[in-house]
Amino acid sequence: LDLLIKLWIKDIFPKNKSIKLYSTPSELINNDYNIFARNFEDKKTMVKDLLKSKVLLVPGHKGELYCIAAEEARELCIPIITLGIGSLSERVEHGITGFVAKNYDEFAYYTLEIFKDINLWKSLRNNLIKLRGSKKWDIVAVNLLNQI
């Protein structure tokens, strides 16, 4: 999360000050850079809040084996931008369900493009709508176990 906040403050927010980043935990909130607390009252409220999101920004973590947050975003038809760290390169189909950036500059670029180009966002979202429900847990489990 520290990496995302750093990229947001340095490379994303200065180029588009109208966009907002919703995050947790609260000690990282910084209204000067449009970083706000995400609402986690209950599951229903959380899903409604997530559905308002235009994109999920998740660089990834080397300790992630699956990243359920990416699958939740996929099923909610929210495009994902990632650096592909950990399992994220397996969760995101580059140019179809989001973008796997090769570096920090690309991460910032793809983030800004999704907010700038409504047709790009619609294309990714339409792809996600078509793919909704296509991942079955028995297949996901087999794929995970095959990596062991």
Give residue ranges: language-model regions.
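Conserved catalytic-core segment of nucleotide-activated headgroup transferases in glycan assembly
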Residues: 1-36
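Conserved active-site histidine-acidic residue motif and adjacent donor-binding/catalytic loop
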Residues: 33-50, 61-63
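Short alpha-helical segment that forms part of, or immediately flanks, the ligand-binding pocket
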Residues: 47, 70-75, 89-90
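Acidic donor-binding loop of glycosyltransferase active sites
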Residues: 51-65, 78
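Short glycine-rich donor-binding/catalytic loop of glycosyltransferases
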Residues: 61, 78, 82-89, 103-104
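Short glycine/acidic-rich beta->alpha loop that forms part of the nucleotide-sugar donor binding site
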Residues: 64-67, 74, 84-85
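Conserved acidic donor-binding segment of nucleotide-sugar-dependent glycosyltransferases
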Residues: 94-105, 113-118
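A charged, aromatic-enriched C-terminal amphipathic alpha-helix characteristic of glycosyltransferases
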Residues: 102, 119-148
